[in-house]
Amino acid sequence: MRRVFGAKKNTEPPPSIQDASDRINKRGDSVEDKIKKLDVELCKYKEQLKKTRPGPAQEAVKARAMRVLKQKKMYEGQRDMLYNQTFNLDQVSFAAEGLKDAQQTMTALKSANKELKGMMKTVKIQDIDNLQDEMMDLMDVSSEIQESLGRSYNIPDGLDEDDLMGELDALEADMGNETEADGMPSYLQPDTETDYDSELNLPAAPTGHNGAPHGRAQAEDEFGLPAVPRASLRG
């Protein structure tokens, strides 16, 4: 059957922009190397022209140098053409990469949009408002509880301005009664030190000279103390 209808040929995939750009860059680099070699030859011919005298020999050197120069110009034209192709391919590659980035961005945005829609289904603004209202109510109840717990007991609520003025007048009268001769209340006067010795009425400490009765002198020893009487010896 293959002989009659023929076998299907395997088609190769078309080259990508990057493959084509790499191949052209290699060709351009090869041409650039050839141009550098021709520059070296031209430098040699220039040195030979300086050393040779005008005549047939110098003309032969000029002819060879002219041939090398023509080859260089041809290679430079090919190099410029290849670099232009590379530039065009780079522009196309940049545009293609930009489109790929745009596609990926669109895909990411669609996925994010779908995810946000799913999240918005579980979060409703009405539920949030209701939650806020409930929290405000709870805070009000908490404030009332704290205020109730902080109340003071046994404080009369029927006090008015007359009661206040009466209390102040009574305090002023009490303070006037406590005011002493110098016009200063007793509670503002400095404290006086108490003479504890006079209150206790303690006698003065006896001295060595006043201990003996008047009219009779008492003998003292070398230390100022009363001398011990010596017993008399009987014969």
From Swiss-Prot:
One of its GO terms (cellular component) is multivesicular body membrane. Residues 20-29 have a biased composition (Basic and acidic residues). Keywords: Coiled coil, Endosome, Membrane, Protein transport, Transport. The keyword Membrane applies. Gene3D superfamilies: 6.10.250.1710, ESAT-6-like. It is a peripheral membrane protein. GO terms for biological process: protein transport; vacuolar transport. Residues 1-29, 175-235 are annotated as: Disordered. It comes from the Eukaryota. It is found in: Endosome, Multivesicular body membrane. Residues 99-148 form a coiled coil. Probable peripherally associated component of the endosomal sorting required for transport complex III (ESCRT-III) which is involved in multivesicular bodies (MVBs) formation and sorting of endosomal cargo proteins into MVBs. Interacts with SKD1/VPS4 and LIP5. Interacts with VPS2.2. Belongs to the SNF7 family. This is Vacuolar protein sorting-associated protein 60.1. It comes from Arabidopsis thaliana (Mouse-ear cress). The lineage of its organism: Eukaryota, Viridiplantae, Streptophyta, Embryophyta, Tracheophyta.
